[in-house]
């Protein structure tokens, strides 16, 4: 079935809405749903009625936790929107959304401008090369300053942020904006919830300013594309001769090439500027065609290939989110990069191996759904029937098996023990933990070998608190949790080797395995790699996989204090076997023993998570705050002044940050705030290492 005209690839936009917490992301999305006809009533976040925040925890806390997907139509385009969380504990949601988007709207608060979390999200978008347009929201707030917000984008994000609108008034007097492309003013009607506005001449007191801003915009566009001599000549000789279409085409080109970030303004809460933002998304954001070909690895030829966004090509898709729906069970969200997906199709999962059949296809609107028979290139679909697929898996047709670039997930930094309140809940708890860890790759579940306790680990206290809450609500499991603990790691500092034999003889058939390993430190953050360099069959092929499994198990429990060993390169170099006594289990046990024997010789050390901490404090309390951070083994990496406050940037070990919010409140009489996010892992000082090992 051919796709409808509105859904042609050139008319498709896959966008995310990203920002700092409280910049108004969900409110903006609610307005988009309202004006595009998706919802007939505006849901307010502070009333707990926002459509996109559909989890009970989100409605209570007024924050967005999972990236809800929804589809809207505006003018001639189909827009898939992913609303992403701004809280740092849910960075994975932002990361996985950006991986499958073609463009993003970055929201900034007109009062605070660029905040620490905005920098994190911007960096993530840089990593995936996602084009962005900026929307300065909350122009009706006390202290709103559009031009200061643009300045902070340029200074802190190094963004090429150029206004394409000029606000008319600010704070309580914010009336609308001037469109610098059309050189017309939009004045909004409050009585129609902003659905109507008057297009008028530019107010006389703003005319000169707008002419100057337009000239700056055109000059910037001319320098972006020096090959377009016609455009440059018109800008230099007669800028008024440029048509709207020519200017829009130049803006679009700059956005699609990721060289230009147009800045719009408005107040989503007061219903001003949202329709103009939608117009900008359609006019300037890239379609899957503009994003071009996607790199993939062809498993038949073992070569890199380029996938063309085309419905007639073989199917290639990426699973980017798994959710458990109370009515339909497991939902797998996918982005289709090429081909057409029909209900009932069997897909090859090249990441995990094996085929699975899709029984139903759904188009999602926050937590409502619409059944569809097929989806096309560029679409974001929710599939039912995929039991094995997890986040980051490649799904394709067996005619052309390929692998798409995999997604990377940060290591958890905090852990706690969890146990069911009653024995009867043990199985339910195991199911709940399994289900939640499939949904969220940054949530890990392990068992402490010594105590038998179940340990959950995640990206922060709020992250684990919300998952604990979900167990109660969604899975009906009552569980007790221990105090939060730091998720330490171990690593090695020098190369080493081991020659290990595992021999067991107790009458009858014995057990025999012999494994020799060479291990050395890997690059920081690169993870573990285990490679078999066995030649000549000294260890038979069928025993290599169990040996690797044993080594991986050894890596997962470390040698100093039972923490994961990370950033270790392991080569299996030699070994031997016995025709009768060797078996898979013997080689698995021997692999684990050999790894530990080698690691003990390699001067192992404990690593601790270091947090990037940004404290905003009145100047009067700056000395106390810095002194306290130093006492916490923190390193001050910089500070800046912003609107009468000082922002202190520091790197502090997570173990020193428990209970920090209470102390900061008393240090600053409740006037300082802070945000923190995981930065990297670093060696702990030897004295602290000894204390950790004793515990």
UniProtKB/Swiss-Prot annotation:
Q: Which residues bind GTP?
A: 19-26, 83-87, 137-140
Q: Which domain of life is it from?
A: Bacteria
Record's subcellular location: Cytoplasm
Q: Which UniProt keywords apply?
A: Cytoplasm, Elongation factor, GTP-binding, Nucleotide-binding, Protein biosynthesis
Show the Pfam families listed in the entry: EFG_C, EFG_III, EFG_IV, GTP_EFTU, GTP_EFTU_D2
Q: What does this protein do?
A: Catalyzes the GTP-dependent ribosomal translocation step during translation elongation. During this step, the ribosome changes from the pre-translocational (PRE) to the post-translocational (POST) state as the newly formed A-site-bound peptidyl-tRNA and P-site-bound deacylated tRNA move to the P and E sites, respectively. Catalyzes the coordinated movement of the two tRNA molecules, the mRNA and conformational changes in the ribosome.
HAMAP family associated with the record: EF_G_EF_2_B
Q: Cite a single GO BP annotation.
A: ribosome disassembly
Main localization of the protein? cytoplasm
Q: Which SUPFAM superfamilies match?
A: EF-G C-terminal domain-like (SSF54980), P-loop containing nucleoside triphosphate hydrolases (SSF52540), Ribosomal protein S5 domain 2-like (SSF54211), Translation proteins (SSF50447)
Q: Which residues form a coiled coil?
A: none
* Family matches, as SMART domains: EFG_C, EFG_IV
User: Is Iron set as a keyword in this record?
Assistant: no
Residue ranges constituting the tr-type G domain according to the UniProt record: 10-289
In terms of InterPro entries, this protein maps to: EFG_II (IPR041095), EFG_III (IPR009022), EFG_III/V (IPR035647), EFG_IV (IPR047872), EFG_V (IPR035649), EFG_V-like (IPR000640), EFTu-like_2 (IPR004161), G_TR_CS (IPR031157)
One annotated Gene Ontology cellular component of this protein: cytoplasm
Spell out the protein name for this chain: Elongation factor G
- Entry's family note: Belongs to the TRAFAC class translation factor GTPase superfamily. Classic translation factor GTPase family. EF-G/EF-2 subfamily.
GO-annotated molecular function: GTP binding; GTPase activity; translation elongation factor activity
